[in-house]
Regions:
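Active-site neighborhoods of metal-dependent hydrolases
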Residues: 208-275, 322-356
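Histidine/acidic residue-rich metal-binding segments in metalloenzymes
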Residues: 96-114, 122-257
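His/Asp/Glu-enriched, well-ordered alpha-helical/loop segment
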Residues: 250-317
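Divalent metal-dependent hydrolysis catalytic cores, especially in the metallo-beta-lactamase
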Residues: 24-25, 38-63, 81-93, 109-122, ...
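Short, electropositive alpha-helical surface patch
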Residues: 86, 161-180, 198-208, 262-282, ...
Length: 356
């Protein structure tokens, strides 16, 4: 028996799942050699992906955006995924003018991504003050045009475990000042963030990653240091993880999937100053199925990965289906000789077998 894409409650059997094709509303596709690896792994499982703009140089204008999009599409086509659609974003930075955002929207960019300066990889150019008058005009333009504001919600100067919670006052300010602006709090990791998103109007939503459904801080530093579990925002407490897990399976349309899959070369992870980011795209479908099954919530998986995000962004739902079966497989210990994936060497219980 196969689950239906028309009635989520029909996805009840535990050996085969068929759902509408999936979206990833937070993906790092990188550049050059890493891009040639990241794109096929994302396109293999996701019909669309919201592409993060924190490359070098950052996607801050149409020339860079067009070139980057063409590079992604070229790799996707050559890898056998001609239908893959990269949803492009523009990086919001100090000093940006509203005209740039207007052009970005006209070009087809669906979101502007705001990183607090220094918050994560390649965020040296970002936002130092969300309340600056010049950025107010940018946010007003986004609000008027229906463009989504995607935010990395951390305050970089706060202690690591408090950065997300400290940012929530900025999230609340943005939601109050720009009541029609759609805002996504990316990759939430704390109970306080879940509660804040729930308390704010329907214009505010959040993405949840697969790795934050599995990790706590102990998985990063509790025994031996595991650099392949290091990401930003860093994994938090058991209580925080429980809140994020409950949000993912709640059926609340404010919460949807964004992988934040972020590949780095092995030598840049296993070193004295390792990069933040976890490469999850090869295992995300398997782990999501495993997690939702463990919580007796497979009937809500499709909405989390295929419906809620698309509806929030005002996009049509994907056509076609993706099928997973319950069949053990071992995650490779390394991809392309230099990228270590999440759950490397472990045996997972679900695997993708068909896309149509």
């Amino acid at each position: 028996m196969t689950g239906s894409i028309n009635n989520e409650k029909e996805v009840v059997m535990n050996t085969r799942i068929t759902t509408r094709k999936w979206d990833d509303f937070h993906a790092h596709l990188r550049q050059e050699e890493l891009l040639r690896i990241a794109v096929p792994h994302t396109a293999a499982y996701f019909e669309r992906a919201l592409v993060m703009p924190n490359i070098k140089p950052p996607v801050c204008d149409m020339l860079v955006a067009k070139r980057y999009r063409n590079e992604i599409l070229d790799v996707a086509h050559r890898s056998g995924y001609p239908d893959f659609e990269p949803l492009m974003t523009i990086k919001i930075v100090d000093g940006m003018n509203s005209g740039t955002v207007s052009l970005a929207h006209a070009f087809g960019m669906v979101a502007g991504k705001a990183y607090p300066v220094g918050a994560t990889t390649n965020s040296e150019e970002g936002v130092s003050d969300f309340r600056h008058p010049r950025l107010r005009r940018v946010f007003e333009e986004m609000e008027a045009g229906g463009m989504v504001l995607s935010v990395h919600g951390e305050m970089p100067l706060a202690p690591s475990l408090e950065r997300e919670a400290r940012f929530l006052c900025e999230l609340e300010w943005l939601a109050t000042q720009f009541p029609k602006l759609k805002i996504v709090m990316e990759h939430i990791t704390t109970r306080k963030a879940v509660e804040a998103v729930c308390s704010l109007p329907s214009t505010v939503a959040a993405t949840i990653t697969v790795h934050h459904l599995f990790l706590t801080l102990d998985d990063v530093i509790g025994g031996k240091l595991n650099p392949h579990h290091f990401c930003k925002p860093i994994a938090k407490t058991l209580d925080d993880r429980a809140a994020v897990q409950e949000a993912a399976i709640s059926g609340n349309p404010k919460f949807f999937f964004g992988s934040d899959s972020a590949p780095h070369r092995r030598e840049n992870k296993e070193c004295g100053a390792g990069e933040a980011g976890i490469f999850t795209s090869p295992v995300a479908p398997s782990l999501l199925a495993e997690f939702f099954e463990s919580r007796e919530s497979l009937h809500r998986l499709e909405s989390f990965v295929s419906r809620f995000g698309a509806e929030f962004y005002g996009l049509p739902l994907n056509k076609g289906t993706i099928t997973l079966i319950k069949e053990p497989w071992e995650v490779p210990r390394i991809y392309s000789s230099f990228i270590v994936p999440f759950k490397a060497g472990e045996t997972l219980q679900w695997k993708v077998v068909e896309r149509s």
